[in-house]
Amino acid sequence: MINFKNLFSGQSVLEEVDSPINGKITVVKSLALGTYFQVGKLTQSGGVVFDIWKTTLNKVRSMVTEPNNILILGLGGGSCAKISRKLWPYTHLTGVDFDKTIVELGKKYLGLDEVNADIVVSDAYEYVKSVSNEKKEYNLIIVDLYVGQEFPVIFESDGFLENVKKALSQNGLVVFNRLYFGEKRPQTVKFFNKLQKFFSKVEYFYPEANVMLICTK
């Protein structure tokens, strides 16, 4: 049966999947926004998220020299990875996500398998701890670790931030994606203040409803 509501709104649901990490993930195809993933009431990958990262990474491009090594913590469906690959075609790109389900959906619907990235299904905290112990360094680290609307507190901990800093090259940048509406605003301001204790410089950038916290080692 034709869903006239979806027909007239210009969007359709391609698939719904239950993830043990993110809960229900809905894959939506929209005439206006293309294909995107919705988790709860937020777009997780594709659609407006793609535009947010495109704006952000073009800003970052003017702040960092050509990166040899990029680490994305919270790969999701791969929006950030696709844009990074286009902006820096010769970089070594690593994407980490704990949710295998959303990674597989990214390959199926958003072209993640065409990005030429090392994809690691792992806990971001443990991964960063491991690479920092190995003294592995990245010129650009992107931290996008929301589960729905929640940013797990472990990724605000001293231990995590210390390991991220260790994994960052001397002239590198780390970008934290944070929500910035309602009750999220004071949480993000508090986190911004904490970052200033770990990094020599912390700037903020507003692409739409989010705020990006851009840190220099």
PLM region descriptions:
Residues 2-88, 102:
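Class I S-adenosylmethionine
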Residues 11, 18-21, 180-217:
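Class I S-adenosyl-L-methionine
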Residues 36, 173, 212-214:
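Ordered hydrophobic segments in well-structured contexts
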Residues 40-42, 49-54, 108, 134, ...:
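Surface-exposed beta-strand edges and their flanking turn/coil or helix-capping segments
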Residues 41-43, 123, 199:
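Short, well-ordered turn and helix-capping elements at secondary-structure junctions
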Residues 48, 152, 179:
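Short, surface-exposed alpha-helical recognition segments that flank or form part
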Residues 54-167, 173, 183-187, 208-210:
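The AdoMet/dcAdoMet-binding core of the Class I SAM-like
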